[in-house]
Amino acid sequence: MFPCTDGLKYKGYLFPPINFLEGIQTTYPRMVSQKKYTKLGSLKDYQDLLERLKKIPSMISQIIDLLKQGMREGVTYPRESLNGVDDQFEKLQGDVEDSPFYVRFRDMPGSLGRHVVSRIKTEAFNITENEILPAFRRLQEFIKYEYSSALRSPPGVSSIPDGAEFYQATLSWHLGTDLSPQEVKLDIKHPLFYLLTSSFTHRFKILASRRWKPSRKKQKLLSRRWDSI
C-alpha cells in the first residue's frame, strides 16, 4: 500500500485544478448547474448549496497562492495543459441570470415559500455577481498575465525538480507496484494497461474500452487531446 501522505514531498498540490480537463472553471460550474450532479429538492438543499458557493472565492484565493508557490519553486504546469483555459474562464463572465452558479436558484420553486425563496435568490444573485465571478476573473487574469510566463515548455514531469521521482511515485500509487517506468510499457494489449486505467476515473475507463483502438499508433494516442471529455 502507498499512503497518500507518502507523496506530499513531491508537491503535487502545486498543480491545483486549473487545467483544461479538470479545472475549477469547468468542474464547479458543471457540478452546480447540472441536476444530475447536485440534486435540489428541499429548502435546506438550496441553503446548503448557497453556503458552498460562498466558499468558492476563498478556494480560488488558495489556488492562486499555490500557483505562486509553484512559480517560486519551479513546479508549474506545462504549457499544453492550459490550452484553451482562458476561453473556459471567459465563458463564465456573462449575464448573472444565466450563470451556472445562479441558474438553480433562479429556477427555485415558489412552493418552498415565497418570502424565503426571494431572499435566497437575491443572496445567490449578489454572491454570484459580486464575489464568485470577480474571483474567477481574478484567477483568469493571474494565469494569463503572471502564471503563463512560468509555464514549462517540456511537457514531461521530469522537467520539474525531482520530477523523475515524482513520476515513479505516481506510477506506484496508481499501479500498486514498484515497477519502474522503463518496466511498464503502456501497451493497450498488455494486462497492466487495464490495471492502470482501472485506477483512474470512470471516464478513462470509457476511453480505454471505446476509443483507444489497437490500430492507433502510441504516439498519436499520447499527443491527442480529448475535447469531448
Spans of features found by a protein language model:
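N-terminal maturation segment of proteins
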Residues: 1-229
